[in-house]
């Protein structure tokens, strides 16, 4: 049986004291422990940003990739070795600015993996610039007179693009977040969770108190399979709602669709098909660069 200690390494997180990302890391650990996923069956892929440091704090397979490109790496890892539980992490800038082209297609493509976005409405690692999630009027180094663009409604965008699992949570509500992560891992297809994770250093506007005042939970009896209701709920709450907002179990995963198109699944993991050159060939290839 896996324990939280199994996922710890010797690297100490260096987020700011009070950063919401500590809560996200704790919830992810709780979820993989509850699912009894051994570290060698977990792959943690991240992009660039404060959020993306999280991959270095897990004892598991992983890759700290390039800015906005966590999803191409993560989807490749999953398709090459479908036995791995793959979780990708980004911040709102990484996911919805430089990486938005990849994010939209991941929503549509439906590879069987989980994507957690740690949303603090600001670029933190580069010391405080407006992100696609920043509120109108938010003053930063890049918006000294206040942001004037409307923030991107990410859950509405995900549903419109064809995502099959769309959830939102607040890192303070650890029990809900752990439950949503487990549901995401159980879902066959691409699971997207947007997690509100306050930045205490560069975003004094969207603080812990602000989220406590503005966030609402989904009502009792809410049906996450109703797409129209999901979109209406997001519109009525200005996107500030938490819970499992939408789930579609009828759309096949990318893996199943690919297998059907190719007359059946690949007989073995793609990782076993890698052609490894012998030493002589490897040396000759290296000599060409000397």
Give the predicted meaning of each segment.
Residues 41-47, 88-91, 117, 169, ...:
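Beta-strand segments within the central parallel beta-sheet cores of soluble alpha/beta enzyme folds
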Residues 10, 199-290:
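Flexible, low-complexity linker and terminal segments
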Residues 52-56, 177-180, 253-256:
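Short, solvent-exposed polar/charged micro-motifs at secondary-structure junctions
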Residues 17-25, 66, 147, 151, ...:
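Generic structural signal for well-ordered, non-membrane alpha-helical segments
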Residues 49-51, 93, 197-199, 249-250:
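Short glycine-rich anion-binding loops that position phosphate/pyrophosphate groups of nucleotides
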Residues 97-114, 118, 122-242:
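Glycine-rich ThDP/TPP pyrophosphate-binding loop and its adjacent helix/strand module
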Residues 1-124:
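Thiamine diphosphate
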């Amino acid at each position: 049986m896996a324990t939280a200690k199994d996922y710890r390494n010797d690297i100490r997180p260096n987020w700011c004291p009070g950063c919401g990302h500590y809560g996200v890391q704790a919830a992810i650990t709780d979820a993989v422990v509850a699912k009894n996923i051994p570290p060698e069956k977990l792959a943690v892929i991240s992009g660039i940003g404060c959020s993306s440091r999280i991959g270095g704090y897990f004892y598991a397979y992983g890759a700290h990739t390039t800015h906005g490109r966590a999803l191409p790496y993560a989807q490749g890892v999953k398709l090459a070795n479908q036995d791995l539980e793959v979780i990708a992490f980004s911040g709102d800038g990484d996911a919805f600015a430089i990486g938005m082209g990849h994010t939209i297609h991941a929503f549509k493509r439906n590879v069987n993996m989980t994507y957690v976005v740690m949303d603090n409405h600001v670029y933190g690692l580069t010391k405080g610039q407006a992100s696609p999630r920043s509120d109108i009027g938010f003053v930063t180094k890049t918006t000294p007179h206040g942001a004037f663009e409307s923030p991107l409604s990410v859950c509405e965008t995900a549903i419109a693009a064809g995502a099959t699992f769309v959830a939102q949570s607040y890192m303070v509500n650890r029990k809900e977040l752990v439950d949503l992560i487990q549901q995401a891992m159980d879902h066959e297809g691409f699971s997207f969770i947007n997690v509100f994770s306050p930045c205490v250093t560069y975003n004094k506007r969207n603080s812990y108190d602000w989220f406590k005042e503005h966030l609402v939970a989904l009502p009792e009896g809410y049906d996450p399979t109703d797409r129209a209701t999901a979109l209406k709920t997001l519109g009525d709450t200005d996107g500030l709602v938490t819970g499992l907002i939408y789930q579609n179990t009828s759309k096949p995963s990318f893996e199943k669709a690919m297998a059907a198109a190719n007359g059946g699944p690949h007989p073995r993991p793609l990782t076993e098909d890698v052609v490894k050159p012998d030493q002589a060939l490897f040396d000759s290839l290296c000599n060409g660069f000397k």
